[in-house]
UniProtKB/Swiss-Prot annotation:
The keyword Phosphoprotein applies. GO terms for biological process: response to osmotic stress. This is Serine/threonine-protein kinase SRK2C. It comes from Arabidopsis thaliana. Keywords: ATP-binding, Kinase, Nucleotide-binding, Phosphoprotein, Serine/threonine-protein kinase, Transferase.
Length: 343
């Protein structure tokens, strides 16, 4: 870990806190997610690492490596300087249809790539959609903690995700197609970009999760009169927000929809852009590191001594000056099975 120095805190998420770091040799910036060793290294963490490392696409945050400190597991990944798409919408209120399409095209490109590798995300939302720092921002999907691989796992049947984005079939305890559920979540993202509000929240009581779930189950939504949305876009949304997953539009059909194809960037016709190769760490190395991280730790404080840096005070990861904030719980990410009382 000695090769990285900490620049600043950049937030907290489902499993830990994140820091912006700089590679001392290349000067490249990376984001590092720190997860406390021991019980917090659960199946979600392992799934996130193993699925994320296999994904190499311009619209997905690039996984670099996983490392151990004395007290934490550290996930090193690409840094998205543009922040969350959520923040951009909060600042703008809502996007024009052209701007919403620009971001939606990239989102679908990244999700389609995941699905081509039999990986469904299962927690797609604006907060998990980052932007790079370029003038025409590139979408970067992140946070694969809830993702499920069709190669490694059976069809998902657990109720996970964020209530506002969750598909009707996910609310049941039966198996469902995670890819089709991802389509629904992409539709919610598109709607929020266009309208500046969630499609299934009751405008008079947006915090009532039971009302939200009731509207989701009925696919009950409306586009406000004050928002100008083309008929083509309305048609696409109506094909996404279909309660029966068997009748819902697929990613492939979205890619061929007339609204989606308008102003489609050339590189999306030609396939993925050239990207850096996969992590240099082997699967065996990563599995060993994860298993080590699961073992109870005996170190009493901080990140001191990680990577053998001992008591250095230069701000490098693992130095004794390192101070991690307490992990925050993301209360938006809840098991909605707890909400399923009679409507």
């Amino acid at each position: 870990m000695e090769r990285y120095e900490i620049v600043k805190d950049i937030g907290s998420g489902n499993f830990g806190v994140a820091k912006l770091v700089r590679d001392k040799f290349s000067k490249e910036l990376f984001a590092v997610k720190f997860i406390e060793r021991g019980q917090k290294i659960d199946e979600h963490v392992q799934r996130e690492i193993m699925n994320h490392r296999s994904l190499i696409h311009p619209n997905i945050i690039r996984f670099k490596e996983v490392l151990l400190t004395a007290t934490h597991l550290a996930l090193v990944m690409e840094y998205a300087a543009g922040g969350e798409l959520f923040g951009r919408i909060c600042s703008a209120g809502r996007f024009s249809e052209d701007e919403a399409r620009f971001f939606f095209q990239q989102l679908i490109s990244g999700v389609n790539y995941c699905h081509s590798l039999q990986i469904c995300h299962r927690d797609l939302k604006l907060e998990n959609t980052l932007l790079d720092g370029s003038e025409a921002p590139r979408v970067k999907i992140c946070d694969f903690g809830y993702s499920k691989s069709g190669v490694l796992h059976s069809q998902p049947k657990t109720t996970v995700g964020t209530p506002a984005y969750i598909a009707p079939e996910v609310l049941s305890t039966k198996e469902y197609d995670g890819k089709i559920a991802d389509v629904w979540s992409c539709g919610v993202t598109l709607y929020v970009m266009l309208v500046g509000a969630y499609p299934f929240e009751d405008p008079s009581d947006p915090k009532d999760f039971r009302k939200t779930i009731g509207r989701i189950l009925k696919a009950q939504y409306a586009i406000p009169d004050y928002v100008r949305v083309s008929d083509e876009c309305r048609h696409l949304l109506s094909r996404i927000f279909v309660a029966n997953p068997e009748k819902r539009i697929t990613i492939e059909e979205i890619k061929n929809h007339s609204w989606f194809l308008k102003n489609l960037p050339v590189e999306m016709y030609e396939g993925s852009l050239m990207m850096n190769g996969p992590s240099t760490q082997t699967v065996e190395e990563i599995v060993w590191i994860i298993e080590e991280a699961r073992k109870p730790i005996t170190v009493a404080t901080g990140l001191a001594g990680a990577g053998g840096s001992g008591g250095s005070s230069n701000g490098a990861i693992g130095s004794s000056s390192m101070d991690l904030d307490d992990l925050d719980t993301d209360f938006d990410d809840i098991d909605t099975a707890d909400l399923l009382s009679p409507l």
